[in-house]
């Protein structure tokens, strides 16, 4: 779901994202991660997919497989502490950036007062669905329990987190597993391979 923010908050987040986070994050991304980066985008991802397809065909012919996938409820299940920790590593845990990110992530927290103590104790690691959450009666959302997970799709910081949060997976697939024909756009990805077993692995 998309949640709006105040104009002053939006200005702060634009500056933080455009001038601070994106230049640092971009250095860590594979070229075939196409979302939310100037000069890339959905058209760039389509072009890269076509390039991969052509190169694959020249190397392997028409034998092989393409595995398409996405991260289940990706934005709903981004854990704030992990995302913030990854971002702060880019800035040697700078105190001011830490403070600013903490304020923003706090605004993303989800009221889960309706949960039992058992549900609350495991909610960070259970799959959260914001669409189902919207069906919870408002009178059960009392502000007593908050979950530090989930980000707002419409927020610019969420877009930065979306491209960066799984970057270790990108690097693992691309470089450790040597999958040249791999690309990702936010939570959607693909791998082309002549080996079905390798893709299943």
What are these regions (language model features)?
Residues 2-11, 95:
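Structural motif
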Residues 4, 8, 41, 75, ...:
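Catalytic cores of large soluble enzymes that bind and process phosphate-bearing ligands
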Residues 13-18, 163, 167:
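Short, hydrophobic alpha-helix immediately C-terminal to the catalytic nucleophile
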Residues 1-5, 50-58, 178:
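Catalytic micro-motifs at enzyme active sites that drive phosphoryl/nucleotidyl and oxygen chemistry
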Residues 17-79:
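Active-site-proximal segment of RNA-dependent polymerases
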Residues 13, 42-45, 158, 162:
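Phosphate/oxyanion-binding active-site loops and adjacent basic polyanion-contact surfaces
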Residues 5-9, 16, 155, 159:
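Aromatic-acidic/polar surface patches that form glycan- and anion
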Residues 59-186, 190-200:
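Conserved polymerase palm-domain catalytic core
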